[in-house]
C-alpha cells in the first residue's frame, strides 16, 4: 500500500488506526493455490483467531476458504459471516464440554485434543465422526512462545496415548475421520515441517475411517527486506510425497487441510499511530506515541519485529530511536530502530499488523480500542468504529 493512502486514512479517520488491504489477502491466497496445485484434494481454512472482523471474514469466505475456530464465539461469527458449517473446524483447547456440545448442535466439525474430552464426546455422540489433534513432540517455530507441538506443550494428544486412541477406534467407541497437527508459528526450516508431516501420515494409517489430515499453520512470512520465510514449494512437495506414500500403502486418498492465519492477513495490515512527544535521555531517544500494547501487543508479548515507517517524513535521514506507548507499563513497540527523522505529530506506521493485532487488543488503562478500515476496490471503508466511553461502561452495573 502506498504511503499516500495510509497517510490519507490517518488524517481522515484519526489515530491510532488499523488498516487492511484486502487485495494482499487475496494475493497471499493465490500463492498458496499455486504452491499446492499438484495436491489431489486440499482446502485452506483461515485461522479466525488472527483477525475476526466480519468484513474481512466475509471477504475471505468469498475466496472459498474455510474457517478454523478455537472458541464457540468464533464458530458463531463464522456462521453469521456465511461460512458453510461443514467447512468450519472447531479446535478448542481445555473448554468445558458444554461448548463442544453447542458446536456439535450447530453442525460444525469437531477437533479435540484431550483424552478426557474425547471420552465425553464418545459417551454423548457414539460413533459420530471426530477429528483429533496430535502432539508430535516436535519443537518448531520462531521462539518458545509460539512453539506448540513439543512434548511440554498443553496442545494435542501426546504420542504415548496414541495407542489408546487406536484401540478406542478399533472398538468403535470413537470414529476418527480426521487428524490434526500444528507444531508452531514462523517455521522456516522445512525439515521441521517434514518431521510433523511424516509423523501424522504414519499415524493416519492406523485409523480405519480416516478421511482428512489437517497440517495446521506455521508458514512464515518475511517481516523485513531479506528476512527468512518458508519455502512454500518445498513444503508442498513434502506434503505431496507423504500423501503419495500413504495412497500407495493404503489405497486411500485423503483431504489435506491447511490453517494459515498470519500468512494470509499479516502483510495486509498496517497499524498507524501519532507521535505525542519526543523524550530524550542519556541513552535513548524515546518516541512517545498515542497507543501502546493495549492496541498492539505482539512486540511486547512475543518480542516480534514490525517494520516502522514515518509516513509524515519517509525519506529524511535516519536516526536511532525507541518507540514506546502511553500505557503505565513497559510497552516498548520498537527498540533502537533507524527510522527517518521523527517530529512531534508525525504519523508512524507499523507494518505486518494484520494478524493478532486488533484481535489481541484490550481496554487496559481504560483506553479505547481503535477503529478498523479496509482498502477494497480502490476505496477506503470503515469496518469498525472506534470505541467510546459508553462502550467501556455499558456492561458494568452501578450498585450505588
State each model region's role.
Residues 1-109, 115-128, 167, 171-175, ...:
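A charged N-terminal "starter" segment
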Residues 3, 253-400:
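Charged (often Lys/Glu-rich) extended helix/loop segments that serve as interaction or gating elements
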Residues 5, 21-24, 28, 32, ...:
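General structural feature for long, well-ordered alpha-helical segments within catalytic domains
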Residues 24, 48-52, 73-74, 94-96, ...:
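Active-site-proximal loop/turn and secondary-structure-junction residues that shape catalytic pockets
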Residues 25, 49, 71, 103, ...:
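Conserved, mostly hydrophobic/aromatic
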Residues 66, 89, 111, 131-133, ...:
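Structured core elements
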Residues 127-139:
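Glycine-rich, aromatic-flanked loop segments that form ligand/cofactor-binding clefts
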Residues 136-277, 339:
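Active-site loop/helix belt of alpha/beta enzymes
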